[in-house]
Amino acid sequence: IVMPNLVPPVTTIAAAEAYRARILAARPPELAGPPSHSQGFTPLMTCYLTDDARADEIERGFKSGVFTAVKLYPAHATTNSASGVTDLGKCRAVLAAMERLRMPLLIHGEVTDAAVDVFDRERVFIERHLTKLVRDFPGLKIVLEHVTTKDAVDFVRAAGLTIGATITAHHLIINRNAIFACGLRPHMCCLPIAKRESHRRALRAAATSGDAKFFLGTASAPHPIHD
């Protein structure tokens, strides 16, 4: 799955096709075989959801095989998310079309309200937005990306079969203590930020449970090589 948070973001079929071509051109020789080859590499492109996203463009992209999913970034929640969604109410036509098409919505599940503690942003997103989204669009396929809390694990487990979640390797390895061990360690900071040990244990239990609702998400945002 290729994330669409470039600058400018991947919001059209043409932009996704151009980005896919760039990715394929950068493949090392050992990954240059056709998709059917055992070592082949097939980038699955996604569309960046915005307040003014067009349902017809997303439907054409999905039906043509260009878009595999749509990615929801709350505006200013993470890397290159300035163009993200400010109000899910503005996206209802797109979400209804996706529900009809059985097209997955991939969600960075954090609120950006400055009044919410950074360690609570995932939990509050679930309470304020995800619960309502699932209620309003019960057939919508949703993946809650890079979950970091027991709250998210419990929500996904309790939800229907259309709801899943990814878990990153680093959120299985570190808790929030790692950020402050012997001073501030900025290379341990990521978004969503690591949480307390009880949450890490819940993630590990989910990742090793055999429950197909939970699967790997490497969560590497697009950055220039020099960064």
Which residues does each PLM region occupy?
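Metal-cofactor-binding active-site regions of metalloenzymes
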Residues: 1-82
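Conserved active-site loop/cleft motifs that coordinate metal ions or position small ligands
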Residues: 1-2, 215-217
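Histidine/acidic residue-rich metal-binding segments in metalloenzymes
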Residues: 53-72, 78-216
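Short, intrinsically disordered, charge-balanced linker/junction segments flanking boundaries
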Residues: 225-227
